[in-house]
């Protein structure tokens, strides 16, 4: 037991206030880091503020690895590096480290060292409520910043509801997929077969209100370097699904006019969403790996691009006996086109770009 009137504070978190202190926050941090204390320091945060009269003062949060019993009220004194002036702080044990941290960083002129230590009292007490923390997380602007706030101020939810939090914040802070910018205009494609052009005009040549409820898709087969991919992608805003299907909201948008399905094996598509995509079906779900089901708005056609040959050709795949019923369905929902020549004039910009962009077609 300390003697009556003696100084003694035992705490893991210390809140220091230097009421008149001209030392920079960087110098203060250096001196506090170099204090010789039997308990390891884990985190230090310092804020420099100005009084109404312009005089500076410092607020400091120091966190230790375990409880530290401070019996020397001069321990945290700071010394001016240019003269012998000492700056003595008011010393308190901080019951809620999060509340103190929030107070220290409120004006923004701060510096910190180490990793902030979360404790149960921070989540329960002080002025911080669940609603306050949720509002702060929502206003943080990014998923990463929101998760940091929740981890610090609602650690129980962070630990036991992490998966749900992560999924929810993905949706809340979701950014629309970047719009693909075509490297050259649609007019570069001067050798488009009539049937392909009729299909494009029948859909893109109409307003959204005049388009059918479930528009017809198109399957285009042809050798590599014919211009299939570039033509398909220059028609308008679209989702580009290459090699596999990915409906993650970060890459797939419900606000486009069509899908481009490029180099996706027919065997794979049959196991996934053949009818939903080629049939322009509306309001269906797809399961994302490690995530919750994604709701697909649908109602848009697909342009399927493939090479000839076993494993690639959709026509050859559908001609197999075991796919007879799927073939009958597909013939009612898609147009088949086989191209034998480039869709552009040789030597045009499209020809050059195709060599870089379309290695497999």
Curated annotation (Swiss-Prot):
For activity, the cofactor(s) needed are: Mg(2+); Mn(2+)
Q: Which UniProt keywords apply?
A: ATP-binding, Covalent protein-DNA linkage, DNA replication, DNA-binding, Endonuclease, Helicase, Host nucleus, Host-virus interaction, Hydrolase, Metal-binding, Multifunctional enzyme, Nuclease, Nucleotide-binding, Nucleotidyltransferase, Transferase
Q: Mind listing the GO molecular function terms for this protein?
A: ATP binding; DNA binding; endodeoxyribonuclease activity, producing 5'-phosphomonoesters; helicase activity; metal ion binding; nucleotidyltransferase activity; structural molecule activity
The name this protein goes by in its record: Replication-associated protein
The leader peptide range reads: none
Supply one GO CC term from the record. host cell nucleus
Which domain of life, per UniProt?
Viruses
Q: Where is this motif: RCR-1?
A: 15-18
Upper lineage is: Viruses, Monodnaviria, Shotokuvirae, Cressdnaviricota, Repensiviricetes
């Amino acid at each position: 037991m300390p003697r009556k009137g003696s100084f003694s504070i035992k705490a893991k978190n210390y809140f220091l206030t230097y009421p008149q202190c001209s030392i920079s926050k960087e110098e203060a941090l250096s001196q506090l880091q170099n204090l010789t204390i039997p308990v390891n320091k884990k985190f230090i945060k310092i804020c420099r503020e100005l009084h109404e009269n312009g005089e500076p003062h410092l607020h400091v949060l120091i966190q230790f690895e375990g409880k530290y019993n401070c019996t020397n009220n001069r321990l945290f004194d700071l010394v001016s590096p240019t003269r012998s002036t000492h700056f003595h702080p008011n010393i308190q044990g901080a019951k809620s480290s999060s509340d103190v941290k929030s107070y220290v960083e409120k004006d923004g002129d701060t510096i910190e060292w180490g990793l902030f230590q979360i404790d149960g009292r921070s989540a329960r007490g002080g002025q911080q409520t669940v609603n306050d923390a949720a509002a702060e997380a929502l206003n943080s602007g990014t998923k990463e910043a929101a998760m940091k706030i929740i981890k610090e101020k609602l650690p129980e939810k962070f630990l036991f509801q992490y998966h749900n939090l992560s999924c929810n914040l993905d949706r809340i802070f979701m950014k629309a997929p970047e719009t693909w910018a075509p490297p050259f205009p649609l007019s570069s494609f001067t050798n488009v077969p009539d049937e392909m052009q009729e299909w494009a005009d029948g859909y893109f040549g109409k307003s959204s209100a005049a388009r059918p409820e479930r528009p017809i898709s198109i399957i285009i087969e042809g050798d590599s370097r014919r211009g299939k991919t570039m033509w398909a992608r220059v028609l308008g805003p679209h989702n580009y699904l290459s090699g596999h299907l990915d409906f993650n909201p970060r890459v797939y948008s419900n606000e486009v006019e069509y899908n481009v399905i490029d180099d996706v094996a027919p065997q794979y598509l049959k196991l996934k969403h053949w009818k939903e995509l080629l049939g322009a079906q509306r309001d269906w779900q797809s399961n994302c790996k490690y995530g919750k089901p994604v709701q697909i708005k649908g109602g848009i056609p697909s342009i399927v691009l493939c090479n000839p040959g076993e494993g690639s050709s959709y026509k050859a795949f559908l001609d197999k006996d075991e796919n007879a019923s799927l073939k009958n369905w597909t013939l009612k929902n898609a147009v088949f086109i086989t191209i034998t020549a480039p869709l552009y004039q040789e030597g045009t910009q499209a020809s050059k770009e195709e060599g870089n962009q379309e290695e497999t077609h």
